[in-house]
C-alpha cells in the first residue's frame, strides 16, 4: 500500500568491492536526508591483483558488514525498531557479495518485523539524483561504471526503458584495462584521469567508436585495442608517453560519449517528450572531464545536467536506502525468500526490450 508518511530506511550495499550501509530519511513531501553513509572500500585488498577478486570481496563483506551497519545506525542515532524498512542490493553484482548483503538484510527484517526491500543496484543509481535534487520524472540517465554503460529513460520508480548500452566493454572497465596495460595502479579510472591532465590528447589518432550511428549504443573494445597497439609500439614507455596515451584515450571517450548522448537524448525526446534533466551516475561520473562534457551535452540539448556529488556516484549505502525508501513509499516490498541475482535487467518490466549487439546488455 502506498504511503505519503515519512520513513527511515537502512540501506546495505555489497555488490562489488565496497561494503556500505546508510540510513536515509524520506520525508512526507518526497525529499530526502542522509542521516549516515558509511563506506569501506576494499581497494587495498584487491590492488595486488589489479582488479576485484570475487572470493576476496565476499569474505571481506562477511568480516566487515556487521560493524559497518552498527556504525551507520549509531551515527544516524536510530534504533532498529525505528526503521520503516531494510533495503539491500539484491543484484546485479558479484553473487557472493550480493548474498552476504541480502541475507543480512533478511535477518534484520525478520528479527525486527520490518519490511524488506530488495533493490536493483542499477535502480539505486538511477534514483539517486532524486535524493540530491528536486527532480521530477521523466529524465534521461547516463549510467557509467565498471560493469555498466547505459542510456536509460527514467519514467518513474520501477519504470525504465533502456535506450542504449555498451556492445562490449563497460566504460569503467575500459578505463581500468587501459590503466593496467600502461602500468598504472588499481583502480585505474582515477589514475587515467590524473595522467591525462598533463598529456597531449592530439598526439595519437585514436578512433571514436560508434560515432554517427543511429542507435545510441557504445563500443570501447576497439579503442582499447588501439591504445594497446600504440603502447606496444612505444615500449618502453616514458612518463610522457603514458600521459599522452591517457589523454588521447580519454578524449576519444569524451567525443564518443557526447555523440552517443546526443543521439540518446533525441530518441528520448521523440518517444517521451523533453526530459526534465540529463543525469549521470556510476563511478565514471566522478571523472571531472566527463562531468564537464556532460554539461555541454545537456546545454546543447536544451536541458540541464543534474549529478549527485562524486561520493554518491560510486557505490554506497545511501543510494540503496533511497531506492528502498522510494519503493516503500509506493508500497513495494519483498518477501523474505527473495533470491539474490548476479544479473538483473533494470528494464526487465519491458515486454519487448531494444535489440542489442550481445549478451553484455543483459546486465
Curated annotation (Swiss-Prot):
CDD domains: ASKHA_NBD_TsaD_bac. Binds 1 Fe(2+) ion per subunit. Substrate binds at residues 143-147, 176, 189, 287. This is tRNA N6-adenosine threonylcarbamoyltransferase. SUPFAM superfamilies: Actin-like ATPase domain. Fe cation binds at residues 121, 125, 315. One of its GO terms (molecular function) is iron ion binding. It comes from Rhodopseudomonas palustris (strain BisA53). Required for the formation of a threonylcarbamoyl group on adenosine at position 37 (t(6)A37) in tRNAs that read codons beginning with adenine. Is involved in the transfer of the threonylcarbamoyl moiety of threonylcarbamoyl-AMP (TC-AMP) to the N6 group of A37, together with TsaE and TsaB. TsaD likely plays a direct catalytic role in this reaction. Disulfide bonds: none annotated. It is an enzyme of class 2 (transferase). It holds the Pfam family TsaD. One of its GO terms (cellular component) is cytoplasm.
Amino acid at each position: 500500500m502506498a504511503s505519503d508518511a515519512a520513513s527511515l530506511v537502512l540501506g546495505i550495499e555489497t555488490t562489488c568491492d565496497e561494503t556500505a550501509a546508510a540510513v536515509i530519511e524520506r520525508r512526507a513531501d518526497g525529499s530526502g536526508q542522509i542521516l549516515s553513509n558509511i563506506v569501506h572500500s576494499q581497494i587495498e585488498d584487491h590492488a595486488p591483483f589489479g582488479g576485484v577478486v570475487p572470493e576476496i570481496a565476499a569474505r571481506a563483506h562477511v568480516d566487515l558488514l556487521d560493524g559497518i551497519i552498527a556504525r551507520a545506525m549509531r551515527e544516524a542515532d536510530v534504533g532498529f525498531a525505528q526503521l520503516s524498512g531494510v533495503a539491500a542490493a539484491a543484484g546485479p553484482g558479484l553473487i557472493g557479495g550480493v548474498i552476504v548483503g541480502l541475507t543480512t538484510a533478511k535477518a534484520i527484517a525478520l528479527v525486527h518485523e520490518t519490511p524488506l526491500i530488495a533493490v536493483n543496484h542499477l535502480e539505486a543509481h538511477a534514483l539517486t539524483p532524486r535524493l540530491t535534487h528536486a527532480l521530477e520524472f521523466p529524465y534521461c540517465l547516463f549510467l557509467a561504471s565498471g560493469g555498466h554503460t547505459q542510456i536509460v529513460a527514467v519514467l518513474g520508480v520501477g519504470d525504465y526503458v533502456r535506450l542504449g548500452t555498451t556492445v562490449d566493454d563497460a566504460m569503467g572497465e575500459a578505463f581500468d584495462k587501459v590503466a593496467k596495460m600502461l602500468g598504472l595502479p588499481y583502480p585505474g579510472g582515477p589514475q587515467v584521469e590524473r595522467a591525462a591532465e598533463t598529456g597531449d590528447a592530439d598526439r595519437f589518432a585514436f578512433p571514436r567508436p560508434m560515432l554517427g550511428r543511429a542507435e545510441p549504443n557504445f563500443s570501447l573494445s576497439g579503442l582499447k585495442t588501439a591504445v594497446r597497439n600504440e603502447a606496444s609500439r612505444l615500449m618502453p614507455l616514458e612518463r610522457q608517453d603514458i600521459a599522452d596515451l591517457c589523454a588521447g584515450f580519454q578524449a576519444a571517450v569524451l567525443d564518443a560519449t557526447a555523440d552517443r548522448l546526443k543521439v540518446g537524448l533525441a530518441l528520448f525526446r521523440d518517444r517521451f517528450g523533453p526530459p526534465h534533466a540529463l543525469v549521470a551516475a556510476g563511478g565514471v561520473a566522478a571523472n571531472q572531464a566527463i562531468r564537464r562534457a556532460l554539461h555541454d551535452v545537456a546545454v546543447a540539448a536544451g536541458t540541464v545536467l543534474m549529478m549527485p556529488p562524486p561520493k554518491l556516484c560510486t557505490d554506497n549505502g545511501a543510494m540503496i536506502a533511497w531506492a528502498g525508501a522510494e519503493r516503500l513509499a509506493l508500497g513495494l516490498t519483498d518477501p523474505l525468500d527473495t533470491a539474490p541475482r548476479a544479473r538483473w535487467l533494470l528494464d526487465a518490466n519491458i515486454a519487448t526490450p531494444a535489440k542489442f549487439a550481445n549478451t553484455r546488455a543483459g546486465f
